[in-house]
Swiss-Prot record:
It comes from Chlamydomonas reinhardtii. The keyword Transit peptide applies. Signal peptide: none annotated. Belongs to the PsbQ family. GO terms for cellular component: chloroplast thylakoid membrane; extrinsic component of membrane; photosystem II oxygen evolving complex. GO terms for biological process: photosynthesis. PANTHER family: OXYGEN-EVOLVING ENHANCER PROTEIN 3-1, CHLOROPLASTIC (PTHR33399:SF3). Gene3D superfamilies: Oxygen-evolving enhancer protein 3 (PsbQ), four-helix up-down bundle (1.20.120.290). GO terms for molecular function: calcium ion binding. This is Oxygen-evolving enhancer protein 3, chloroplastic. The gene is PSBQ.
Amino acid sequence: MALASKVATRPAVASRRGAVVVRASGESRRAVLGGLLASAVAAVAPKAALALTPVDLFDDRSVRDRGFDLIYEARDLDLPQNVREGFTQARASLDETKKRVKESEARIDADLDVFIQKSYWTEAREQLRRQVGTLRFDLNTLASTKEKEAKKAALGLRKEFIQAVEDLDFALREKDQASAAKKLEITKAKLDSVLAAVL
């Protein structure tokens, strides 16, 4: 018997299922309404997100020349250690070093006396420590440019200046106004003698 005759003679099987009724549930309605609400919010949201003022763009490529990337240089392991710590850059220009020293001297002369008279002990200590932090390094740099005997004398004067600064710092920590004023004058005199030797 051929395949066509087998298919044609097969008896038809009646479906055992009855009629299927589809009902919409409340959850599917909520999902549809939620989707509509979300699309409406998405359509309105970009208008609300617009800035009231325009965005200003600045070309700050020149700040790299002024030292903006120093923190990244400090982390760059491909650079030598003295470059990463900034020692090479600070010693590169003696004119900049002299300018920093004169600025520190001016701040010590002008600010510390006012802070001591007003009993601003914390400000006086912080200003002193800020200025001496750079002066230690810069005085060494300036002394290293001198001849052997002049360098030795300058480093000796620097050591006396640092001791006077430590005495002044102790007087500031003790909050002794008379002692601090006296030691400030000694510190200024020692700084002037060091600067006369290195500048």
